[in-house]
Each structure stands twice: as structure tokens, then as C-alpha cells.
Amino acid sequence: MDFSPSATSRIWLQKAQTFFERYVLPHNAAWHQSVADGVYPPPFLADLKALAQDEGLWNLCLPTLPLGAPGTCLSNLQYAPIAELLGRLPWASEVFNCQAPDSGNMELLLRYADAWQSARWLAPLLNGQIRSAFAMSEPDIASSDPANLQTSLRRDGDTLVLQGRKWFITGAAHPDCRLLIVMCRDLDGVGQIDADGHRQHSLVLVPMDAPGVQVLRNIPMLHHLAPEGHCEILLHDVRLGPQALLGQAGAAFAMAQARLGPGRLHHGMRSIGQCELALRLACARVRERQAFGHHVSAFSNVQDWIAQSRVAIDQARLLLLQTAWRLDQADSDPHQLRSDVAAVKVVAAQLQTQVVDRAIQMFGAMGLSPDTPLAYFWSWGRAMHLMDGPDEVHLRSIARHSLRQSADQGASLAAYFTTPEQLQSPPRIR
């Protein structure tokens, strides 16, 4: 494994950094003011997106693209440091058409959409003309086990009929959101025969303006109301043509992995960027502030916090780069890769809450205010412990993989023991 940036990676990172510092970062205060005034998206965002596309800084997060589609086809490893850069501003990714959940939805459509679906949905997403959302979690069941999902899909002749309720659907309140990808229980598709519940669900492409689709509310998270939305949505007798079914009936869980793996990696790298910024802000703060006749940076507990954060960020970055590298390898063990992606999800959430919490403590009361990005970083980090599945589900997946590996290695591990029986039976060399 070699994580050192390639020449291509360095070129694109430099271009992205120059654009970010010249055009995006100077608009940060204006973005917040616009959102506070109820104007979303801010009027300058379209100009920034057009400029980024003109400079080729577009769809940076997609390793594969259709012929003629705008983008760079950077590998996951090449995109990782760019994602870290963009993570410093939560809204920056949209400038480059790399924002969640659209990036994951585009990955899904790239793999499974037919020609009609690609023209209808994928092309405008790739061009940044529309936004989308992915509807999985539900309010009345434990969504951490996706086999519990109850939103139903039935067939009335050639018509697909959806009924149910989803919530915490990111992006659904965006004015440009046109597509809702819904995971639903297929009541009469081929998936109904599966006993363990993992081939009973299908994915359906639902236009946001379809009759029966109703956004009930935008749910605040820790008193933060995201302008793009984390919405509760009612699907009441939504009727669609057969072309709305994405991929095979009953294959929703397997298909969803196409978006969750890279998506979790992108979330993780953006977390690294936010943690780096939090640490830099905290270091600058304690160097300039004095208490009890000394700079705050001179206190040993503050130095411990800084050192712990530095070590944790570097450790997490190495894990994420390793996972990005493995995602790029065609021959990677899928079980190991699934465990790595789960580890990324857990580590990124833990890192962000711990590093940002220390930074807030070093800032003092100002760290709790909207005057710095720290309060938002902390609330987003806390949400990461639950989004895309709670930490405990991912830890369970990691443990199961480790236990399977241990079972396969049982015989070879016996030689490491020195029990009385083994001491009495030395091996023969000849």
C-alpha cells in the first residue's frame, strides 16, 4: 500500500485548494447570512457551481462516469484529500457537485439505472441541475435493522403503488430536490420468498412532485435546522409506472451497498477536514488567550488535549486512506472491505465528537455559539453516531468479521500456546 499522493492527485488537490480559498471560503459569511435570512440556496451558489464546472472541478467524487459526462474520474484514494479539504465548510461540496446524498445516489444510478432512468435522473444529477434524496429510515420501527422496513410496494397491474412513511431524509427540503429513491418492502415481487428478510425489499425512483408524496416536516437535529432538510415524508398511495423500479425486485439491500461504501468514506474524510480545522482553531485560540498569568497553551492538560487530538486525527486518516485504497482495488476481499467501511463509520464519528469537544473546551463559551463552526461540527459529529446505522451495528459487523477470521486461523494459532501437553510433545525437525 502506498498512500503518497500521485502526480495526478497533487494536481487536482492543488486546483481544488486554490479554487476553495479564492472563491468558496470568502463566501462563507454570506452563505450563513443568506440561510439566516431564509434565502436558500444562496444566490451566489449557482455562479460558484458554474465556475467550478468551467474549470473542470466537477463530479470529483465519482471514479467512473459515462462517456461524455462531466467529471475527473479520480480514484477514491485520489479524491480523499479533496474531500478532507471540502469538509472544512459543510456547504462546499455542493459547489463541486460532490455533496451527499447526491454523490451516493449517482453511484447507485451509475450501476443500476437503465437507459430511460439514466436520461431521466442520472444526467441532470451529473450536471448539477437537480438534487435528490434517499429514503430508508422509518419512524415506527428500529431502522438499524433494515429488514424491519415496512413502507410497502405492491403492484396494480403494471402500476407500482407505494404506501408508508419515512423520516430523517437528508436533502428532501432542498428546493431543487426532484428525486426520492425509496427503499420499500416488496409485497408481491420476487423478493417475497426470502425467509431471512434480506431479499424482500426493492428500490423505487419516486419524483418528488408525484401525487401522494408529502413532506410533513423538516426535523431539527440538536436544535439545528438544516436548510436542505432532514425530513419526514408521507407516501400515500403513490402510483408510478413500471420504469420506476430500479434494478431487480428484492435486491435493494445489495444495491444499497453501492452507495453506502463510498458515501461513508466521503463522510469520514470530510470529518477529518472538520477535525483538522477544529484543532487549528483551538491551537490559535489557546496561544493568544491568557489565564492566571500564563498563555492557556502552557497548561499541561491543554497540551494533552492537543496531542490526543493530533494523534487521533492522524490515526483516523490512515484508516480512511487504507479503506479508500482497498475500494479502488478490483480484487479486494469484499468481507474485509465491508469491515473496513464499518470501521471508518465508527472511527469518524468518535473522532469528530472527541476532537471537537476538546476544541470547544479550549475555546470556552464562544465554542458553544454560532460565531465559530465548532458547535455545528459537534452536533454533526453526534449525528454521525446514528446516521447510516448506529455505531453498535457497525461494531457488530466488525466483530463478526474478526470472529470468522479467527475461526479460519484456529489450527495455526495453536502453536502459540505453551500448555503442559505441548511442552511434552516437541516437534521433530527431521
Residue ranges of predicted features:
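Alpha-helical interface subdomain recognition
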Residues: 1-90, 99, 112-117, 124, ...
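A short, Trp-centered hydrophobic/proline-enriched beta-strand micro-motif
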Residues: 128-137, 182
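Long, acidic (Asp/Glu-rich), low-complexity accessory segments flanking structured domains
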Residues: 237-254
